[in-house]
């Protein structure tokens, strides 16, 4: 809970010159967010969204995605970052996990639109199928 340590972790999460320190920092920040301790809107959450959107390492993007999960229902920026990952991440495991994280916001029309796009256009048949199944579940719950 030390603000100085948090500041250093955020700085290391943004600095890719030392890949191991970068990945470890994202991991620690993500763990803190999942535990609910230090991920209020601001630098930590933003660092995880940047890592999810732009990091070359799938492992780092995965950790960032996991850290953002508790905030998808409350933070439009997080929701948009997860939807962007679903549409654009090159790793099918990350796209698949992104679908699973959307449950708290499944009734949101923008979420359904993205899922429909993925169900129709994703290169990976498994992801298309998971998206269709998710949309079917949402349709049944709405009716």
Task: Please tell me what each predicted stretch does.
Residues 1-7, 25, 64:
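PEST-like low-complexity intrinsically disordered regions enriched in Ser/Thr/Pro and acidic residues
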Residues 2-13, 36-52, 74-86, 108-119, ...:
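Amphipathic alpha-helical scaffolding segments comprising HEAT/armadillo-like alpha-solenoid repeats
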Residues 18-20, 42, 54-59, 76, ...:
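Alpha-helix N-cap/helix-start positions at coil->helix boundaries
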Residues 20-29:
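HEAT-repeat alpha-solenoid elements in large eukaryotic scaffold proteins
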Residues 25, 64, 97-98, 131:
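Conserved hydrophobic register position within alpha-solenoid helical repeats
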Residues 29-32, 36, 67-71, 102, ...:
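Hydrophobic core/packing positions within alpha-helical solenoid repeats
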Residues 37-40, 56-61, 71:
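Mid-length scaffold segments of soluble, non-membrane domains
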Residues 116-143:
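Eukaryotic acidic, Ser/Thr-rich intrinsically disordered low-complexity regions
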């Amino acid at each position: 809970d030390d603000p100085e340590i948090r500041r250093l972790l955020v700085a290391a999460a943004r600095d890719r010159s030392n890949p191991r320190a970068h990945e470890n920092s994202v991991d620690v920040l993500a763990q803190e967010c999942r535990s609910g301790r230090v991920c209020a809107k601001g630098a930590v959450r933003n660092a995880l969204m940047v890592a999810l959107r732009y990091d070359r390492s799938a492992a780092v993007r995965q950790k960032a995605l996991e850290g953002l999960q508790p905030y998808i229902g409350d933070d439009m920026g997080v929701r948009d970052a997860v939807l962007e990952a679903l549409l654009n991440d090159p790793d099918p495991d990350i796209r698949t996990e992104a679908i699973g994280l959307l449950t708290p916001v499944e009734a949101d029309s923008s979420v359904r639109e993205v899922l429909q796009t993925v169900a129709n256009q994703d290169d990976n048949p498994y992801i298309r199928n998971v998206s269709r199944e998710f949309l079917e579940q949402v349709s049944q719950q709405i009716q």
